[in-house]
């Protein structure tokens, strides 16, 4: 299980669901990290198919024997969306999918639309993580496929506790995978307009990491930027920073933005659907892809203590609205509906 927003969500959600039912997590590939350890300690049974290529359709045949006998089979992310749909004849209970994003590469290919309609139609319920995610999916499919919205959540108390008493430095942090939906490039370019004493930390890995390291080097900024890679102790890295940034091309929700706010740090986020609704009127927004506006926004926080403290307080209050317990209650209602 890789370390991304959906994976971190499950690491908090499944232990709560274990209090109401037996839970098994089936993954395509096993990864040894703290998220998996946390699930195992909570009593969640973790099974890995150990496939070499997650896009191999032969996975369908492997899945059939594993998804029998459950009251609910709940699927997250692509390509599991497809493979479980095609293996759904083996499902004896409810089949549920959670849509996590307002956009993806498949939606740029109109010829895929009939297949997409077929796949989503296999699910008893399609849950979206935000109203914007639901709207985008239904527009793409041309029908009301997703009706239910269950907002993502985090363990707010854990993040607030991890940040308690931690002395932050003049630094910026962004916690995200280096993937097409994320926009670390704009944050790197913004560093040209931010005080030279301010450092930037990227927490996360992914296919576009090397490209971003090359960009930082070409701009002469590599000495001010730390590429941490994947990390388990996300809360610590957030707490050690003065400001958290979530720069995205598109976003279904913005779980990292909530984590930043729960740590009592101001968040500066791209003005894109999904993310905007989570942050607006609490943190600060900037025009997506605009490094100069991002820099001005960060500089305003670092240079104005009153603005900084007011924004941090609003962010902490907003984070309380996204407690993982509410997410668990929402899914339990869907499972039993």
Please tell me what each predicted stretch does.
Residues 4-15, 170, 174-193, 207-214, ...:
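A conserved mid-protein helix/loop that constitutes part of the nucleotide-sugar donor-binding site
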Residues 1-57, 208:
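N-terminal strand-loop element at the rim of the active site
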Residues 293, 300, 307-321, 330-333:
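A short, well-ordered alpha-helix in the C-terminal region of glycosyltransferases
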Residues 26, 266-269:
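Short hydrophobic beta-strand element within catalytic cores of glycosyltransferases
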Residues 269, 284-291, 300-305:
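Conserved acidic donor-binding segment of nucleotide-sugar-dependent glycosyltransferases
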Residues 75-82, 99:
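Short His-centered aromatic/hydrophobic patch
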Residues 230, 249:
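Aromatic "clamp/platform" in nucleotide-sugar-dependent glycosyltransferases that forms part
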Residues 54, 58, 135-139, 144, ...:
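Acidic anion/phosphate-binding donor-loop and adjacent secondary structure
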């Amino acid at each position: 299980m890789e370390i991304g927003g959906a994976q971190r969500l499950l690491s908090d959600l499944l232990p709560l669901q274990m209090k109401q039912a037996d839970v098994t997590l089936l993954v395509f590939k096993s990864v040894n990290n703290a998220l998996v350890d946390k699930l195992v300690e909570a009593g969640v049974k973790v099974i890995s198919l150990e496939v070499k290529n997650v896009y191999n359709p032969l996975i369908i045949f492997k899945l059939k024997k594993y998804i029998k006998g459950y009251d609910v089979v709940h699927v997250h992310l692509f390509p599991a969306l497809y493979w479980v749909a095609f293996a759904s004849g083996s499902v004896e209970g409810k089949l549920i999918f959670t849509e996590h994003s307002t956009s993806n590469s498949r939606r740029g290919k109109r010829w895929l639309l009939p297949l997409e309609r077929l796949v989503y139609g296999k699910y008893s319920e399609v849950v979206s993580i935000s109203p914007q995610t639901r709207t985008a999916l239904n527009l793409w499919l041309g029908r009301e496929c997703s009706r239910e919205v269950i907002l993502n959540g985090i363990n707010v108390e854990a993040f607030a506790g991890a940040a308690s008493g931690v002395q932050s430095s003049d630094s910026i942090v962004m916690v995200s995978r280096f993937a097409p939906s994320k926009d670390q490039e704009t944050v790197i370019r913004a560093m040209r307009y931010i005080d030279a004493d301010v450092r930037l930390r990227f927490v996360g890995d992914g296919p576009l990491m090397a490209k971003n390291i090359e960009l930082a080097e070409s701009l002469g900024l590599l000495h001010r930027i730390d590429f941490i890679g994947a990390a388990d102790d996300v809360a610590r890295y957030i707490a050690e920073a003065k400001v958290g940034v979530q720069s995205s091309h598109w976003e279904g929700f913005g779980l990292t933005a909530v984590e930043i706010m729960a740590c009592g740090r101001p968040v500066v986020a791209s003005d894109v659907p999904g993310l905007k609704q989570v942050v607006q009127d609490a943190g600060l927004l900037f025009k997506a892809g605009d490094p100069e506006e991002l820099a001005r926004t960060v500089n305003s926080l670092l240079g104005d203590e009153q603005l900084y403290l007011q924004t941090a307080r609003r962010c902490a209050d907003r984070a309380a609205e996204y407690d993982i317990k509410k997410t668990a209650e929402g899914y339990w209602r869907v499972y039993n509906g």
